[in-house]
């Protein structure tokens, strides 16, 4: 792997993780805030709220995982390496 | 009116055994009974809530196992054994990831104020292992890891039937 490809891969990996985590991070924060507020207002609905939160977190966090996987592939199994 | 006759002596017996029958005679006693009733109902409801969440996790786990078995069978039949092993490894990682996520969400608001990120180690470790072992393929393992998504969707679709069954 030549030096330009290596440098571009490292930069791309950092960008993939960093940019990919911004959106889900904001979304997860607001979802957790809403869930905790909902549990505080309606403790009897705690089970349902936690279940819905699990579902939404699993789907939101997969966006972060996509970025993480792309970064790891670029670093450890780079398809552009010579 | 056999049911009425049968039910009333049982309740009076239970009351006299707990000493509640005597308490009901006075005002103070009835207040105490109300308080203890409230406590009992709140304990029962919190127990129900946590068990509801645990039951949900158990249902997701079962559906995930079924979807994994189906996907591994299909990949053995139509692709090859290495792809099936990669898929199985990925699916196993997905189950661990979802378990960690559920654990973090379960502790949200109780012991921690934010959801931890420890579960993200699982896909990272999966990719690293797959990249190091030449027999394993990356794409099937990622597909296997993401099998928790159809499981969640199936659970969400089947939830009304499960509620009807339990309720």
Swiss-Prot record, chain A:
The chain crosses the membrane at residues 7-27, 57-77. It is a multi-pass membrane protein. Keywords: ATP synthesis, CF(0), Hydrogen ion transport, Ion transport, Lipid-binding, Membrane, Thylakoid, Transmembrane, Transmembrane helix, Transport. It comes from the Bacteria. GO terms for molecular function: lipid binding; proton-transporting ATP synthase activity, rotational mechanism. It is found in: Cellular thylakoid membrane. Pfam families: ATP-synt_C. The record marks 61 as: Reversibly protonated during proton transport. F-type ATPases have 2 components, F(1) - the catalytic core - and F(0) - the membrane proton channel. F(1) has five subunits: alpha(3), beta(3), gamma(1), delta(1), epsilon(1). F(0) has four main subunits: a(1), b(1), b'(1) and c(10-14). The alpha and beta chains form an alternating ring which encloses part of the gamma chain. F(1) is attached to F(0) by a central stalk formed by the gamma and epsilon chains, while a peripheral stalk is formed by the delta, b and b' chains. F(1)F(0) ATP synthase produces ATP from ADP in the presence of a proton or sodium gradient. F-type ATPases consist of two structural domains, F(1) containing the extramembraneous catalytic core and F(0) containing the membrane proton channel, linked together by a central stalk and a peripheral stalk. During catalysis, ATP synthesis in the catalytic domain of F(1) is coupled via a rotary mechanism of the central stalk subunits to proton translocation. Key component of the F(0) channel; it plays a direct role in translocation across the membrane. A homomeric c-ring of between 10-14 subunits forms the central stalk rotor element with the F(1) delta and epsilon subunits. Belongs to the ATPase C chain family. This is ATP synthase subunit c. The lineage of its organism: Bacteria, Bacillati, Cyanobacteriota, Cyanophyceae, Synechococcales.
């Amino acid at each position: 792997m030549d030096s330009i490809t290596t440098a571009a891969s490292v930069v791309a990996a950092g960008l993939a993780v960093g940019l990919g985590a911004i959106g889900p991070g904001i979304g997860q924060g607001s979802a957790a805030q809403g869930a905790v507020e909902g549990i505080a207002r309606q403790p009897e609905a705690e089970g349902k709220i936690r279940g819905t939160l699990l579902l939404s977190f699993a789907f939101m966090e997969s966006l972060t995982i996509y970025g993480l996987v792309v970064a790891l592939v670029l670093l450890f199994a780079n398809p552009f390496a010579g | 009116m056999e049911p009425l006759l049968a039910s009333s002596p049982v309740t009076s017996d239970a009351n006299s055994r707990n000493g509640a029958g005597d308490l009901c005679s006075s005002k103070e006693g009835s207040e105490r009974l109300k308080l203890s009733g409230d406590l009992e109902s709140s304990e029962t409801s919190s127990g129900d809530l946590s068990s509801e969440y645990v039951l949900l996790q158990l249902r997701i786990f079962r559906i995930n196992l079924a979807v994994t078995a189906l996907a591994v069978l299909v990949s053995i039949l139509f692709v090859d054994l290495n792809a099936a092993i990669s898929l199985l490894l990925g699916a196993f990682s997905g189950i661990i990831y979802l378990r960690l996520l559920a654990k973090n969400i379960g502790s949200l608001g109780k012991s921690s104020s934010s959801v931890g990120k420890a579960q993200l180690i699982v896909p990272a470790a999966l990719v690293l292992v797959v990249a190091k072992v030449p027999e394993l393929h990356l794409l099937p393992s990622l597909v296997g890891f993401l099998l928790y998504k159809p499981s969640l969707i199936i659970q969400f679709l089947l939830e009304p039937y499960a509620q009807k069954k339990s309720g």
